[in-house]
């Protein structure tokens, strides 16, 4: 977690950034589950590292094991089954085949004068959106980026859009994604 608005405020950070193990208790009862849970795996389980600090395997093997442990818990929870949405995505593409160009006309901004590692963007990645509001086997051809996801979350919670998410013309998730009872 590297947001200066969080880490530069230790008391706030201590109250709001909690260990992942707490999620197990939060999921036990729908009323305990926060309306928004943002999970970032540690550096061992984020799919990047070739090995973990303890010498165990990292990379895709570690992230797959991590997801096998946590995703079923989330999907079985009452809160998720009632009205939840689980989005699984990556922060950037990686590897010799990756294309680091930006999606969706993303340009430079104050927070990211050169988005991406090799150029303007983090490359092409996918997102898996699981919810009762998404029909199985849905495939959207609309190009989205991380700001689209942020803007979609802000719309759901009726929040003012932040940064690049408020850029005119930026697509947010619509009926191509939420295509099963979203507005019913």
Each model region followed by its residue ranges:
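N-terminal pro-sequences and low-complexity stem/linker regions of secreted or lumenal proteins
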Residues: 1-184
